[in-house]
Design a protein with these regions (language model features):
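Loop-to-transmembrane-helix entry motif
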Residues: 8-11, 104, 108-122, 153, ...
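Membrane-interfacial helix-loop-helix connectors in multipass membrane proteins
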Residues: 139-151
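Structural signature of transmembrane alpha-helix termini at the membrane-water interface
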Residues: 24-34, 135-138, 173, 177
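Predominantly long cytosolic amphipathic alpha-helical stalk/bundle segments
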Residues: 38-128, 132-141, 177-204
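Residue-level signature of catalytic and energy-coupling elements of molecular machines
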Residues: 9, 23, 60, 75, ...
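Hydrophobic membrane-targeting segments
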Residues: 1-44
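Pore-lining and gate-forming transmembrane alpha-helices of multi-pass membrane transport proteins
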Residues: 148, 152-175, 179
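Alpha-helical transmembrane segments of integral membrane proteins
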Residues: 12-25, 116-123, 167-171
Length: 204
């Protein structure tokens, strides 16, 4: 690995830095979805819909007070808020729920920009490194007149492009995967909002 870092030139180091950032962001997201949100399965989603349709706000607040996933947090907070503010208007309650949902979405999207930068910058830095390497190689050709110097220089210069793509492609795959996970959670949050407002209207 260190050999390729040396022969690839100075642009290998910022790409390596982006690789470390990308790995850290991916591990953080995997921990979020598979450890912190591990209880957010199909059964939980069905149960929360069932409880919103059949249970009181008091009972709902009790059921979901110890859960840490976004759906449970919104349902619990919205239920408890209604119990202490029963005279609130529908528009105020709807605004409250939307604010809670936006807060949960912002937490889910935290650090997404890191993967975005790695996806965009890594291949660009790799291409820049290759171009700089080729300029040096052709400069060596004009000075020495030996074509073998150019071939060797271009071979080394291409390491940066390859390394940049090796960083960007996995980052892109994970980025798309995480976006799909977020979209699924957001769809469920929208359903929760509808059910909460429906329940609220039923109590008016």
């Amino acid at each position: 690995m260190f050999y390729y870092m040396q022969v690839g030139g100075i642009f290998m180091w910022p790409i390596f830095f982006l690789a470390v950032l990308s790995l850290a962001a991916v591990l953080e997201k995997l921990f979020l979805y598979f450890v912190r949100l591990r209880d957010l399965g199909s059964k939980f989603k069905l149960d929360i819909v069932k409880n919103l349709n059949n249970q009181t706000f008091e009972k709902i607040g009790e059921i979901y007070q110890n859960y840490k996933n976004p759906l449970a947090k919104v349902v619990c907070a919205a239920s408890n808020f209604y119990l202490t503010n029963k005279n609130i208007s529908k528009s105020e309650y709807e605004f409250l729920i939307k604010t809670m949902i936006d807060d949960e979405i912002s937490k889910l999207e935290k650090n997404n920009w890191i993967l975005g930068i790695c996806i965009s910058a890594s291949p660009q830095l790799g291409l820049l490194g290759t171009i700089v390497g080729m300029i040096k190689s052709f400069g060596a050709l004009s000075a020495a007149g030996d074509p073998t110097l150019v071939a060797g220089g271009i071979s080394e210069a291409l390491y940066t492009t390859a390394f940049g793509l090796l960083v960007a492609i996995p980052a892109l795959v994970f980025h798309v995967y995480f976006i799909n996970k977020n979209d699924s959670i957001m769809e469920n949050l929208e359903k929760i909002e509808f059910l909460l407002l429906k329940k609220f209207e039923g109590l008016r």
